[in-house]
Structure formats: structure tokens, C-alpha cells
Curated annotation (Swiss-Prot):
NADP as UniProt keyword: no
Superkingdom classification of source: Viruses
Domain description: The C-terminus contains repetitive amino-acids that may function as a cell-penetrating peptide.
TM helices/strands, residue ranges: 209-229
Family annotation (SUPFAM superfamilies): Immunoglobulin
Protein name (record): CD2 homolog
Biased composition (Basic and acidic residues): 256-270
Length: 381
């Protein structure tokens, strides 16, 4: 502090000092004036600088006048003490002026810190550590228990090197001030950042996907119904046109049918089965539509184009010369005849055996002596 004051005295520079204090704390603004000096002024800024006290130092004693002793006190080295009953001291600038030198003191409210917030972005390899509460803070970022970054600001950004760190590592954000300290630890998992980004996008837009599915299903259902209705209407129209264009039955058949229906009634015999009459669409009063001749003149059909003259036949190709006949093959020599087989000797003739004699019955007379009458047969039943 003495070195700073000597520097200010030599170069006539205004020094600014920040004080961080809590509620109901006594604040002492050190002047560190050791030499005898006259014309020491303590001022405070309220839109303009107003004088608190006018002092002078002699024989190591600082004597001041014209100041409110219920709010302030001035020590022997001309330091200003502010009592805690003054609630307007925060965010206020006090000024010490002596020997054409100036020192500005700014008093700020010191608040305790709470746990910070850690966020990360895998695609950018970025970790952000941000404070939640607290003043006059110090932020530290530890990766795998190693301090990698430090700042006095309210947030800290750090880009890690993916070649030095794995896809999964531990990040700790530490925040502290003169009152207390807090930290937050988080596991950084960037094994598949593309898949994770797709998952986040899907979770954020799941309601839009639901509405798209409903719209697609409704469109397909309506298209199917329209196709079915169109198919049925075309089929009915085609059937109606076929009935109109079909030729009427011949007159002889109609007369024959009328004759059969009116004049001759065939009564089936008891043994004849009753057969159903063949169905005819003309036995009912079905309206028959005929095409009315058009009143507009018909467009004449164009005459057919004349056939082109036939192309002349090409001249016949000359026949090739006949091939010479091959020389006849010589006949093979005849095979020698086998010697004749000798005839077998004739069989010896045996005389026939005599017939056995059958004796006649003694009571039968000979044929010549029997009376035989011829009976004429007219009918055989």
C-alpha cells in the first residue's frame, strides 16, 4: 500500500480500491498517511462529491472537524471508519484527497455463494460453469481432479481436447469467496453426441411427430374410402351401359315364349319332375333404353389410304450344281451254306388195337323188328 501511495504521489494518479463487506459490518478505509500532512479531505459521492471531514496530521495525530461522529470515526493515521448503522454505504464511492492526490474507495455488498451450474455441449467440446448466487467470487474448473481453468467472472467456458480426454470424464466446478465455498460435480458423457442430439430433438418434438402420424393415417384412410366409392360407381355405370347396349331378343323367340305362356299350358305328369323356368331379364318389366339418333351432322370418316404397290419379287437364286454320287460299295462275299441235317429214320407202324365187343342185352329185339312211330312236334313249350 505504501508503494502505491508513493507511486501516486510521484505520478499524480488516482487509485481505486474495492471493499467487499457484509451487512452490519464495520468498514475501515485505510489511508496509510504516515507523514505530517495538512489539508486531508474525506468525501463521499452522492451525484456530486460532498465533504465528510477535513483533517490534518501533526505529531502522528490526525485531527478532524465537521463530521458526524454517530456515523464515522477517524483514526490517528486518518483512516475512515464507517459504523454499521449506515445502510447507504453500499455501492457508494468514498474519496480521500491530500497533497493533490486522490484515492477512491468503492464499498460493495458481499453475499454468500451457492452451488454453481455445469452444462456441456458434446458437438463443440464445451463445458460451461456458471454461478447462481454470490459476489466477489472465484470460479475453478477441475477435470479428473486437475484444475484446468480459473476466473473471477460470473461464468467460465472451457473447450476440452478430445484427444487428451476420453468420451467420459468427471468435471467439478468450485466457487468461493471470503464468506463460503460451494461446488458441483457432473459426469461428462459424450460417447455418441450425434445420437444424443437426435434423442433430444425427438423428445422436444414428440408432440409434432404425434400430429404428423395422425395426419398421415387420416389421409391414407380417406384415400382408401374415396378409391372404394369410385370403384363401385364405375362398376355400376359399366353394368348399366352393358344393359343398354345389349341387343333385344328375337321376335320369334318372344312369340314362342308368349305362345307357351298363354295358349299352351303343359301339365306335367305325376312322374315328370317340376323344373324351374329359366331366368330371363325380359320376363319382368325392365325398361329398355334405346339410343336416340343424334341431330347433329356426323363427321365424315376419312377415306382409307390406298395400299402401296407390291414390291417386286427378287430373282430366284440359282440352284447349286448336284453333288457327284459316291462309288457303290462292293458286295460282301456270300456266306457258305451249312451242311444239311440228316433226316430222322421213319417210325415203325403199329396196327390198331381191336375194338372191344359190347354184348347186347338179351331182351332188346333188333331194330328191324321194333315198332317205331314218328311223332310230329308242332310246338315246344
Amino acid at each position: 500500500m505504501i508503494i502505491k501511495l508513493i507511486f501516486l504521489i510521484c505520478f499524480k494518479i488516482v487509485l481505486s480500491i474495492n471493499y467487499w463487506v457484509r451487512y452490519n459490518d464495520t468498514v475501515t478505509l485505510n489511508s496509510n498517511i504516515n507523514s505530517e500532512t495538512e489539508g486531508i479531505f474525506w468525501n463521499f459521492y452522492n451525484n456530486t462529491f460532498n465533504t465528510i471531514a477535513t483533517c490534518g496530521k501533526k505529531n502522528n495525530v490526525c485531527e478532524c472537524s465537521n463530521y458526524d461522529k454517530s456515523l464515522y470515526n477517524i483514526t490517528n493515521n486518518c483512516s475512515l471508519t464507517i459504523f454499521p448503522n449506515n445502510t447507504k454505504i453500499f455501492n457508494t464511492t468514498y474519496q480521500l484527497v491530500y497533497s493533490r492526490n486522490r484515492i477512491n474507495y468503492t464499498i460493495n455488498l458481499l453475499l454468500p455463494v451457492t452451488s454453481p451450474i455445469i452444462t456441456y455441449n458434446c458437438t463443440q467440446s464445451l463445458i460451461t460453469c456458471e454461478k447462481t448466487n454470490g459476489t466477489n467470487i472465484h470460479l475453478f474448473l477441475n477435470l479428473n481432479d486437475t484444475i484446468n481453468e480459473y476466473t473471477n467472472k460470473s461464468f467460465l467456458n472451457y473447450y476440452w481436447n478430445s484427444s487428451e480426454l476420453n468420451n467420459i470424464f468427471l468435471a467439478t466446478c468450485i466457487i468461493n469467496n471470503t464468506l463460503n465455498s460451494a461446488n458441483t460435480t457432473k459426469v461428462i458423457n459424450c460417447t455418441n453426441p450425434l445420437l444424443k442430439s437426435y434423442q433430444n430433438y425427438f423428445l422436444e418434438n414428440i408432440h409434432t411427430l404425434f400430429y404428423m402420424i395422425i395426419f398421415i393415417v387420416s389421409g391414407i384412410t380417406i384415400s382408401i374410402f374415396i378409391s372404394i366409392i369410385t370403384f363401385l360407381s364405375l362398376r355400376k355405370r359399366k353394368k348399366h351401359v352393358e344393359e343398354i347396349e345389349s341387343p333385344p331378343p328375337e321376335s320369334n323367340e318372344e312369340e314362342q315364349c308368349q305362345h307357351d305362356d298363354t295358349t299352351s299350358i303343359h301339365e306335367p305328369s305325376p312322374r315328370e319332375p317340376l323344373l324351374p323356368k329359366p331366368y330371363s331379364r325380359y320376363q319382368y318389366n325392365t325398361p329398355i333404353y334405346y339410343m336416340r339418333p343424334s341431330t347433329q351432322p356426323l363427321n365424315p370418316f376419312p377415306l382409307p389410304k390406298p395400299c402401296p404397290p407390291p414390291k417386286p419379287c427378287p430373282p430366284p437364286k440359282p440352284c447349286p450344281p448336284p453333288k457327284p454320287c459316291p462309288p457303290p460299295k462292293p458286295c460282301p462275299p456270300p456266306k457258305p451254306c451249312p451242311p444239311p441235317k440228316p433226316c430222322p429214320p421213319p417210325e415203325s407202324y403199329s396196327p390198331p388195337k381191336p375194338l372191344p365187343s359190347i354184348p347186347l342185352l338179351p331182351n332188346i329185339p333188333p331194330l328191324s323188328t321194333q315198332n317205331i312211330s314218328l311223332i310230329h312236334v308242332d310246338r315246344i313249350i
